Regions:
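N-terminal secretory signal peptides that target proteins for export/translocation
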Residues: 1-15
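N-terminal signal peptide c-region/cleavage motif recognized by signal peptidases
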Residues: 26-30
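Boundary at the C-terminal end of the N-terminal hydrophobic targeting segment
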Residues: 31-35
């Protein structure tokens, strides 16, 4: 019609020689209206294009593309799509059973597929228990015993090639037919965990998919390849779950470790991604950087499996590398934790497309290629393991026997750990030990060990003569000298130090000093069945780990609450007396209180297991009376965490996690670019994590005025540099050049460069600080020394101003882990915590991370004190 109209117009108004040009124009217009641009590369391939061609596939098993409506790699699979397909496979295949092992913080299912030949299904539980019995006894298993594989994918959500490869692998195991599949499944068991980190995977899938057009863009500058804050690497609270295998701060890790100990697999795979310009890495890593408690035979078997990965990539002409860059030292990551249990943990690292396609020095890297490579090494793992099956079976039994011999021949009989004055921290540690299948006994008589007294029923003894000898040795290590000083992650994770609990090594010659009994029970806090309504006031100590949570619940309910600056002794309604330390919380009944105060207080205290005392009078036998000005009101805080581009998502996430899950405090997270606008919203506390801050001059001025008008500004680690540069915090930080000057570079070769760099770092080590327990930032602490976790070589110049440096590193501060002696000397006796009063407000600086990975319970309360007890600093 359009062409006809144009032809008509041409006849009437244009000369005949012009008509062809008009008609051509009409044709072009008509074509553009009806055009359907076809993408040259949609990305992705049908599932069988990823899989071996010498295998046939059962046509009754649905393919991923038939269920999801797209080829694998065409889009980034979301977790809901992934789980849907796994359920479809389980419904259609008699090889697969599916179990929901837990849920993430965002309520996504954690799935585990158990895959084996149908003939094994009736006997699957007896096969599992026989394997566990052999692991417990160390008896050599028969040659026909099954291998158990735990195939795990994408613990970092923005490293998605693993979980997308799991689609193809699951199909292969469900639908594949022939000798290769029979050899794998007839007498072996595959546990498939398709997504270690569902929340992060879904976050990144949304990012990558929302930026994909019909034409794939390989430009590394495009927004698809420049992920926003926070990244999909982390879980809901922005934690790196590949550091949580030991720490178990999150439900994803707790569920996974439960299944690990239920099955004790022979091989566990851990699929990752790395920089786009890299190639492909598979273990073993740097041999000299493996954990020394891991047997050398583990590396030998890993090398044997590596030969099969290499053979597969050689056949495809793919680039790869091994035995460099990555280590196997930290016990809390996916390729190392299994090694300490007689399993073979294997790390795989694929160069990342970080989207659907990206340019690299090796040419365009398509998402489908990254998926294909992860499938290749998944299959080569099966091939290599079956070829080395007798050696792998023998290794696990030898591991058990060797572990028993190490415990028997060593000088240490065990470790003793005391409760201190805080049952909350102590019980949290006990829960962690139980989840790792570590056995302990209750100390039944007062025991003197290592110049410390451990009280009966308030301490545990952990004998090393048990299956978890290697893990126990690792988590209580105080090693400070290492063969290789380069660490991919931290160099210490001492559990007793993390929980700030007294502990001691028990040498075999001192075992008689530790008395335990099978019927001994740990002392529990004495909790009132009901509190008397006639009390003058109620009070509870600030010592317990969960005291801030009880306080916050009361503030949320509108309870009028006060905190005591000084210790006092009070008369109780039961005619007894009780001493309350500084920071104790007092609830006077004479003030306006909610009608349900009594039931609220009783319910919350019992839930948190915190003793609450009923006071008979406001007149105290010693110390401040209840109406004293030194017992100050605490108002409900309104806390802002500064986040956004440039700020450490890990540290912000750790603080958010602490406030949200352990205190019950609803903190706001505001991007630094929007901080200026937020300052008028009534925040009482603003917290800066490590980061690169670029606040405007107007925002900085407004923030400083906010402090001077009564606000509390808190910073940690590198945020202190920013505070110092703006003269908010009275602190002088040692220049990086001065730190570098401490290290002699004369006669060093180019090959020494990496080792020198490693010496200048603090490789996640434990440092001891001397603390002022009369200072509000340390209310609730009873010992004058505290183990702090240090991951930075930032040093505050030593200075002394009364009352403003309540924590300093000791003269010999290194307790565990690696730090070069030059750094240790620089850090010794320097401030660890600094405060500066500014007008009506205060600025607080922590040189270390008080919330490290949700594990360092011992320093957590410093942050709560900065929130709830900071009124005493103004």
């Amino acid at each position: 019609m359009l062409a006809a109209l144009v032809r008509t117009a041409t006849i009437s108004i244009f000369p005949k020689w012009f008509a062809p040009f008009i008609v051509l124009t009409a044709v072009c217009v008509s074509a553009s209206v009806n055009a359907n641009i076809v993408a040259l590369d949609k990305g992705g391939k049908p599932v069988q294009a990823y899989l071996p061609t010498d295998v046939t596939y059962n046509p009754d098993i649905p393919t991923p593309e038939s269920v999801l409506g797209a080829n694998i790699g065409q889009w980034h699979v979301r977790h809901d799509q992934l789980t849907h397909y796994m359920r479809v496979l389980a419904d259609h295949s008699d090889r697969i059973s599916l179990e929901v092992t837990g849920r993430t913080h965002e309520n996504r299912e954690l799935l585990l597929l158990t895959i084996t030949a149908p003939s094994n299904r009736p006997n699957i539980e007896s096969m599992r228990t026989a394997h566990i019995d052999a692991m417990n006894s160390g008896e050599k298993v028969k040659a026909g015993a099954p291998l158990i594989f735990y195939m795990g994918y994408s613990i970092h959500g923005n490293e998605p090639s693993g979980s997308n490869a799991a689609l193809a692998l699951a199909y292969y195991l469900a639908a594949g037919q022939g000798a290769r599949i029979d050899a794998l499944l007839n007498n072996n068991i595959v546990l498939l965990d398709p997504s270690f980190n569902p929340d992060g995977l879904s976050r990144f899938a949304q990012w990558a998919n929302m930026h994909k057009g019909k034409q794939l863009v390989a430009d590394s500058n495009t927004r698809e390849h420049d992920e926003g804050w926070p990244s999909g690497r982390t879980n809901h609270y922005w934690f790196d779950l590949n550091r949580d295998w030991l720490l178990l701060a999150h439900p994803e890790s707790q569920a996974r470790i439960k299944q690990f100990h239920r099955w004790r697999p022979h091989i566990l795979t851990d699929f990752h991604e790395m920089g786009t310009d890299s190639t492909y890495f598979f273990q073993p890593g740097v041999r000299s950087r493996k954990n020394p408690i891991t047997p050398d035979e583990n590396v030998t078997l890993t090398e044997a499996l590596a030969a099969y990965h290499a053979k597969a990539f050689d056949k495809q002409g793919k680039l790869y590398f091994s035995e460099e860059a990555f280590d196997d030292f930290y016990a809390g990551k996916g390729s190392t934790y299994p090694d300490l249990h007689g399993s073979i943990g294997i790390l795989f690292e694929q160069a990342s497309s970080r989207g659907h396609i990206q340019e690299s020095i090796n040419g365009p890297l398509a998402f489908s290629t990254t998926i294909a490579n992860q499938i290749t090494t998944s299959l080569s793992t099966f091939e290599g393991a079956l070829a080395n099956k007798p050696a792998i079976l023998d290794y696990q039994s030898a591991f058990v026997k060797d572990t028993q011999a190490l415990a028997k021949d060593g000088d240490i009989s065990g470790y003793i750990v005391g409760e201190s004055s805080d049952s909350g921290r102590f019980n949290a540690m006990l829960s962690l030990l139980k989840q790792h299948n570590i056995k302990f006994e209750v100390v039944s008589k007062d025991s003197d060990v290592g110049k410390q007294t451990f009280n009966a029923n308030r301490a545990i003894y952990i004998p090393v003569a048990q299956a978890q000898y290697r893990l126990i040795t690792s988590i209580f290590s105080t090693q400070t000298s290492f063969e290789n000083n380069t660490f991919y992650d931290v160099s210490s994770w001492n559990m007793a130090m993390a929980f700030n609990l007294p502990f001691s090594v028990v040498e075999k010659r001192d075992t008689r000093n530790v008395k335990t009994a099978a019927n001994a029970k740990l002392a529990m806090p004495v909790l009132s069945e009901s509190l008397p309504a006639s009390a003058y006031a109620y009070a509870f100590s600030w010592n317990d780990y969960y005291a801030p949570a009880l306080l916050q619940s009361l503030l949320e309910a509108g309870v009028s609450v006060r905190s005591s600056e000084n210790a006092f002794e009070a008369k109780l309604v039961n005619n007894q007396r009780h001493t309350f330390t500084s920071g104790s919380i007092v609830i006077p009944t004479g003030l306006v209180q909610p009608e349900n105060l009594l039931s609220l207080l009783t319910e919350q205290a019992r839930a948190l297991r915190i003793p609450v005392y009923a006071l008979a009078s406001g007149l105290t036998p010693t110390g401040s009376d209840i109406g004293s000005r030194s017992i100050k009101p605490i108002l409900g805080p309104k806390v802002l965490l500064v986040g956004g581009e440039g700020v450490s998502e890990y540290e912000v996430g750790e603080m958010w996690h602490y406030f949200d899950t352990r205190v019950g405090l609803p903190a706001s997270i505001v991007e630094q670019q929007k901080l200026g606008n937020a300052l008028q919203s009534g925040y009482t506390h603003i917290v800066f994590a490590s980061g690169q801050y670029t606040l405007s001059d107007d925002t900085k001025d407004a923030l400083f005025n906010w402090v001077k008008n009564g606000g509390v500004l808190i910073g940690q680690k590198s945020a202190l540099r920013y505070f110092a540069a703006n003269e908010w915090l009275n602190v002088d930080i040692v220049d990086r050049e001065e730190i570098d000057s401490q290290f002699d570079e004369d006669k060093l070769t180019f090959g020494d460069k990496s080792a020198l760099y490693a010496r200048k770092l603090v490789a996640g080590a434990v440092y001891e600080a001397e603390i002022d327990i009369t200072h509000p930032l340390f209310y609730g602490y009873t010992d004058t020394t505290l183990s702090m976790f240090k991951t930075s070589n930032m040093v505050v110049n030593n200075y002394y101003t009364p009352f403003t440096t309540p924590a300093r590193y000791t003269s010999a501060p290194l307790l565990a882990g690696f730090s070069d002696e030059k750094l240790v000397k620089l850090i010794a006796e320097t401030p660890a915590v600094i405060t500066t009063q500014q007008g009506k407000g205060v600025v607080i600086g922590f040189t270390d991370n008080t919330q490290f990975r949700g594990y360092w319970y011992g320093t957590n309360k410093m942050l709560s004190n900065a929130i709830y007890q900071s009124g005493f600093l103004k």
